[in-house]
């Protein structure tokens, strides 16, 4: 269940709550008291002062309460996504000081003890600041610590000697030696909760997980596992490890009583524990109101929920006295006779017919899509009028200005659609269609509408894709690349068409993408997908070379076989040139001369000098001629006689 509250934290006493919400397209930081001033159940004290961030690109990534020893005042440390750490004074409602890390990497988490402030950024660098002198003391990196999300200080007297950091796994860092001392078993998803509950134990939880692991800092063993009924969002403990309260994703609150005390008598008992108490808040009409944060201290429990979308309300409970399943019934509409005690955003106008309720106002990043349908209908009317104009025959000057490419494109369109169109109408139609696709794409990305996004991505015209991305806002190009990476990773058969969108996003908005800090973490899915696919390129090229080599060998063999077959008819033509005279054979003039002549022809094929050599021929009765000259004379005589 998504909450309008992006960040929230109670002060150490539980009397104030700091929370971060969104007003239009900018974040704002507010602080509200948690105690009721009257017995009527209405919070009469309301702080209307908010710290509005100047730029819509600035985001608060983490926050901590701090008691400044130099001025003896309470302040709030805000970690920003631009690499700065702001010191926000609640009383003055202004930022009194800004720490800087020297780069623009996002601050992931902060923790402080005494006058020391520790933080980590998205480049996995550690920073130590002095809150008295307001300066940076040191910064360093550790090789084995990457993709860090959470940081907490392990108390050791008044000094800080060790740190706990977590990504998917948890590591214990020695500050002096700057190395990993111990590694604890981690979670499948990134760690979102990391707190030290005593000097010997700490607790950790992950995103989208309903399990909390309690570890022994010194031995590294798992003490117990706390199991909630739903995914855990926020955690609060009493400081003595006798009670832990968690808010879950379904809007309930669960309390674990004495989580470190083993109730099993077996030596190898089950280490998992379920919650002892569960609290829910419902309205009088039966609707469930989600709890987004809570603070537990000894016997007192303070729960907070939202009304009118962004207005926090609080209630104190004696949690030890309530039953295991407890439901708090509240009224969402207060009938207050004292209008000065009204908890609406800016009070109520008695002369107004209806009162403004902020929860009914839906604003998404300052863009109003209310008139998108009307705009699309107007564009469709324009397209209809353009098609009517295109049906008219073109003028003479238009025909003269058309190039060969224009005529070719017009003929192609006419062949497909069966209508003749000129270049002017075609360009106007394409431009209007591109504008419509851009509006639909922007709406789909901002509203996270996957079905609407699929209708846009089904477009295969590269020119329309290029013009659409050219008109797209650079900030939305990052979201588009993330959506494309998800589809390429899941649907490999769509990689070709989707690569066209990725290509033009990188070409057109590449300059903006380079200026974004933490680009690797933002587009990590796209980077891993493309890298995994590009790793196959050398193997595919090697396979292509082998296939080319094999095909060339087959072509060579076929060519040689063709030459052999083509040479056979030539030999037959040479044999056809030999004349056979039947009359000479019948007259008995040729007995063995023909054979001698045939043998001479065979020997002449081997060498030009074989005409002068002697040769013998066998007769049918097996006798051999002793003198070759007689045979040659007979052969010559037969030729002369023939002439």
From Swiss-Prot:
SUPFAM superfamilies (UniProt xref): WD40 repeat-like (SSF50978)
UniProt keyword Cell membrane, yes or no: no
Region annotated Disordered, chain positions: 565-643
WD repeat start-end pairs: 14-54, 55-98, 186-225, 227-266, 340-389, 471-511
Compositional bias segments (type: Acidic residues): 570-611, 627-643
Skewed-composition ranges (Basic and acidic residues): 612-626
Other notes: Present with 33100 molecules/cell in log phase SD medium.
Subunit field text: Interacts with snoRNA U3. Interacts with MPP10. Component of the ribosomal small subunit (SSU) processome composed of at least 40 protein subunits and snoRNA U3. In the absence of snoRNA3, forms a complex with other t-UTPs. This complex can associate with pre-18S ribosomal RNAs.
Functional description taken from the UniProt entry: Involved in nucleolar processing of pre-18S ribosomal RNA. Required for optimal pre-ribosomal RNA transcription by RNA polymerase I together with a subset of U3 proteins required for transcription (t-UTPs).
Record protein name field: U3 small nucleolar RNA-associated protein 5
Species of origin: Saccharomyces cerevisiae (strain ATCC 204508 / S288c)
Phylogenetic placement of the source organism: Eukaryota, Fungi, Dikarya, Ascomycota, Saccharomycotina
The encoding gene: UTP5
């Amino acid at each position: 269940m998504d909450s309008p509250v992006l960040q929230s934290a109670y002060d150490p006493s539980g009397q104030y709550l700091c929370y971060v919400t969104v007003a239009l397209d900018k974040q704002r930081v507010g602080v509200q008291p948690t105690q009721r001033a009257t017995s009527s159940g209405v919070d009469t004290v309301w702080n209307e002062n908010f710290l509005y961030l100047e730029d819509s690109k600035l985001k608060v990534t983490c926050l901590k309460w701090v008691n400044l020893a130099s001025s003896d005042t309470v302040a709030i440390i805000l970690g920003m996504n631009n690499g700065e750490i702001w010191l926000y004074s609640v009383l003055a409602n202004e930022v009194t000081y800004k720490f800087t890390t020297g780069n623009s990497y996002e601050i992931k988490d902060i923790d402080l003890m005494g006058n020391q402030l520790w933080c980590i950024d998205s480049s996995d660098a550690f920073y130590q600041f002095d809150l008295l002198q307001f300066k940076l003391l040191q910064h360093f990196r550790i090789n084995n610590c990457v993709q860090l999300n959470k940081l907490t200080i392990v108390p050791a007297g008044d000094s800080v000697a060790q740190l706990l950091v977590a990504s998917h796994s948890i590591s214990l860092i020695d500050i002096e030696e700057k190395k990993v001392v111990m590694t604890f078993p981690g979670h499948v998803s990134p760690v979102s909760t990391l707190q030290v509950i005593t000097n010997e134990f700490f607790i950790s939880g992950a995103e989208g997980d309903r399990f909390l692991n309690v570890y022994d800092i010194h031995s590294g063993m798992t003490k117990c596992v706390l199991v909630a009924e739903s995914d855990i969002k926020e955690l609060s403990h009493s400081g003595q490890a006798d009670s832990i309260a968690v808010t879950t994703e379904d809007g309930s609150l669960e309390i674990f009583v004495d989580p470190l005390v083993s109730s099993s008598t077996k030596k190898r008992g089950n280490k998992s524990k379920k919650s002892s108490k569960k609290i829910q808040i419902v309205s009088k009409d039966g609707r469930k109101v989600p709890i987004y944060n809570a603070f537990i201290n000894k016997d007192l429990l303070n729960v907070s929920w939202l009304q009118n979308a962004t207005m926090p309300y609080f209630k104190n409970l004696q949690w030890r006295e309530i039953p295991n399943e407890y439901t708090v019934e509240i009224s969402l509409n207060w009938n207050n006779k004292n209008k000065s005690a009204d908890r609406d955003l800016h009070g109520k106008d008695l002369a107004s017919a209806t009162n403004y309720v902020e929860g009914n106002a839906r604003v998404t990043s300052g863009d109003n899509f209310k008139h998108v349908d009307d705009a699309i209908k107007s564009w469709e009317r324009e397209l209809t009028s353009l098609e009517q104009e295109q049906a008219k025959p073109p003028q003479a000057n238009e025909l003269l200005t058309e190039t060969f490419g224009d005529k070719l494109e017009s003929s192609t369109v006419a062949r497909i659609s069966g209508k003749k169109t000129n270049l002017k109408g075609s360009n106007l139609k394409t431009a209007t269609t591109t504008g419509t696709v851009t509006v639909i794409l922007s709406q789909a990305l901002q509203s996270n509408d996957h079905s609407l996004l699929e209708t846009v991505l089904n477009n295969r015209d590269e020119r329309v894709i290029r013009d659409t991305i050219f008109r797209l806002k650079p900030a939305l190009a990052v979201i588009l690349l993330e959506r494309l990476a998800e589809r390429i990773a899941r649907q490999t058969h769509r990689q070709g068409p989707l690569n066209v969108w990725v290509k033009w996003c990188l070409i057109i908005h590449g300059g903006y993408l380079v200026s974004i800090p933490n680009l690797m973490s933002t587009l990590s899915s796209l980077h891993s997908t493309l890298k995994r696919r590009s790793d196959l390129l050398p193997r595919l090229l090697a396979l292509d070379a082998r296939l080319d080599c094999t095909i060339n060998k087959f072509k060579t063999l076929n060519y040689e076989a063709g030459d052999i077959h083509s040479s056979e008819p030539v030999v037959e033509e040479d044999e056809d040139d030999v004349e056979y005279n039947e009359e000479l054979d019948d007259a008995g003039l040729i007995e063995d001369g023909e054979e001698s002549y045939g043998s001479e022809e065979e020997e002449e094929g081997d060498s030009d000098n074989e005409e002068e050599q002697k040769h013998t021929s066998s007769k049918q009765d097996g006798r051999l001629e002793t003198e070759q000259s007689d045979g040659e004379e007979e052969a010559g005589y037969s030729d002369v006689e023939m002439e």
